[in-house]
Amino acid sequence: MGRVDPVSVVIDDGVGWSAWPAPAKLNLFLQITGRRVDGYHELQTVFRLLDWGDTIHLRVREDGQIHRIGESVTGVVEADDLVVRAAYLLKHATNVYLGADIFVEKRIPVGGGFGGGSSDAATVLLVLNALWHTRLDVAVLAALGLRLGADVPVFVHGCNAWAEGVGECLTPMILPGAAYLLLDPGVCVPTRELFLDPDLTRDASPATIGDFIAGTAFGNAFEPVLRRRESAVAGALDVLSEVGFARVTGSGSGCFVEFSTRDEAECALERLPYGLCAWVADGASRSPLLDVLKTMEF
């Protein structure tokens, strides 16, 4: 099986530019346990960060302006782009006089449930907080990130985590090393439509971290809905089921299988039919961005 990577575009880093990782994530399970009075659903999930993802290129501006170079996501205007919104959110929260140019080198498929937009936004918050010397602590940055999306805080904290609430109540977890065979079916189903689907299970019995550690398989609440609605997702899960326990990440449409070692994942990749958008990524013990930030002097 030949590997087919998501398309990426590379920028030549010139004077003043710096490059920063924005890792992808997987949801090792996801269930909905109820609905709050404000209409949001109560979730339980485990976030697993990956040692693979997008790259955010940043350059500090002295004139206070925020500019996006190119398009992070095709068709998304600059004002609606999460990376631009993240930069403005930090700027307004701190009254800093500086600005930034932002370029996103995309590898994470859009609409796949791999957390690309949220991770990109978190990287912008963390790195500009350092480059602008605004010195907000992680808890404050995570609170800002939550205003952009429920998945942003886990990337700000940069750790694998058990999550509850709308996904923002995090308990750090130490997960064993693993490698993942990922597959992008190439379809995007709006999350709102999935939450409105009458067949979605919204009243699962609450689980515990102990249940997860014991190996209880909870699955993903969105998987049966996606299977029914999208033949591409059903096909992807069926193909992956030939090599292991296939799961959906997030609200889809991305799918994955976990393996103990990268060699096992690579062997499984070779068994897939040619031409699929499939690749292998290692699980990370924590966000690679934190390691990069730790080595930098600001």
Curated annotation (Swiss-Prot):
Entry EC number(s): 2.7.1.148
Catalytic reaction equation(s): 4-CDP-2-C-methyl-D-erythritol + ATP = 4-CDP-2-C-methyl-D-erythritol 2-phosphate + ADP + H(+)
Keywords tagged on the record: ATP-binding, Isoprene biosynthesis, Kinase, Nucleotide-binding, Transferase
Annotated positions binding ATP: P109, V110, G111, G112, G113, F114, G115, G116, G117, S118, S119
InterPro entries per record: GHMP_kinase_C_dom, GHMP_kinase_C_sf, GHMP_kinase_N_dom, IspE, Ribosomal_Su5_D2-typ_SF, Ribsml_uS5_D2-typ_fold_subgr
Pathway: Isoprenoid biosynthesis; isopentenyl diphosphate biosynthesis via DXP pathway; isopentenyl diphosphate from 1-deoxy-D-xylulose 5-phosphate: step 3/6
A GO biological-process term: terpenoid biosynthetic process
Pfam families noted in UniProt: GHMP_kinases_C (PF08544), GHMP_kinases_N (PF00288)
A GO molecular-function descriptor: ATP binding
Active site (record annotation): K25, D151
Protein family per UniProt: Belongs to the GHMP kinase family. IspE subfamily.
Main function: Catalyzes the phosphorylation of the position 2 hydroxy group of 4-diphosphocytidyl-2C-methyl-D-erythritol.
Protein name in the entry: 4-diphosphocytidyl-2-C-methyl-D-erythritol kinase
Annotated organism of origin: Xylella fastidiosa (strain Temecula1 / ATCC 700964)
Gene behind this protein: ispE
